[in-house]
């Protein structure tokens, strides 16, 4: 093969590799993409009503229950467009696009009249306060943290991964908790607790429930606080 042929082959290989990697780069959050400007900005999003929040991004989300629906995004001014929010079928979904590095804290502040479901995947954080609901469902996968306070009748919480569900400030009559990973669930039940631990994590409960049922099939534990 001639020198020109070798150069063409190498160039083609590099281009092909770049094409193969591009979807991975586009979906990454952090790395060698866009760098945040360092100038913090806020943007208010006007969305349909919702009672569930699904976070699939590495950012901090604060939810205040009560009042009209409101979503305010805070980030570097050149990164706001990379924070996506969509309300559909009663659930607000938050995610990011592109590869970027932040220089200002990225967060989303939410107000909603009611809250019935929280879902977090990845390494983000959700803090929800003043919850008043008949039933609340909390689903967590990954290494993130969910914190909630208020009062509910029924609480269903499922955790897979190494994250934490800090729900000790959420007074619940009946709690059904499943811990599939190495994380930790802290909860409070006043009547009934059903705790299942097929993983290696820990469920810690308070509230002196009259009826406690535990099922441990892994190396995890269920402990009274």
Task: Give the predicted meaning of each segment.
Residues 2-80, 91-111, 220-225:
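Short acidic/polar N-terminal linker immediately downstream of export determinants
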Residues 43-44, 51-63, 100-225:
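Extended, compositionally simple hydrophobic/Ser/Thr-rich segments
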Residues 88:
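Acidic/Gly/His-enriched mid-domain segments of enzyme catalytic cores or analogous surface patches
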């Amino acid at each position: 093969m001639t020198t020109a042929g070798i150069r063409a082959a190498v160039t083609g290989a590099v281009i092909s590799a770049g094409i193969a990697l591009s979807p991975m780069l586009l979906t990454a959050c952090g790395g060698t993409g866009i760098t945040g400007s360092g100038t913090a900005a806020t943007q208010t999003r006007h969305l349909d009503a919702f009672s569930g929040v699904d976070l699939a991004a590495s950012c901090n989300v604060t939810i205040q229950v009560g009042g009209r629906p409101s979503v305010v995004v805070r980030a570097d001014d050149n990164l706001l467009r990379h924070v996506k929010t969509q309300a559909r079928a009663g659930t607000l979904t938050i995610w990011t696009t592109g590869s970027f590095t932040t220089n200002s804290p990225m967060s989303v502040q939410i107000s909603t009249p009611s809250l019935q479901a929280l879902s977090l995947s990845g390494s983000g954080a959700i803090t929800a306060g003043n919850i008043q609901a008949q039933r609340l469902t909390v689903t967590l996968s990954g290494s993130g943290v969910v914190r909630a306070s208020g009062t509910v009748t029924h609480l269903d919480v499922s955790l897979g991964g190494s994250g934490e569900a800090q729900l000790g400030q959420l007074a619940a009559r009946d709690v059904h908790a499943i811990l599939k990973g190495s994380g930790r669930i802290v909860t409070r039940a006043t009547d009934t607790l059903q705790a299942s631990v097929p993983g290696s994590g820990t469920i810690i409960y308070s509230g002196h429930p009259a009826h406690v049922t535990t099922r441990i099939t892994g190396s995890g534990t269920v402990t009274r606080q």
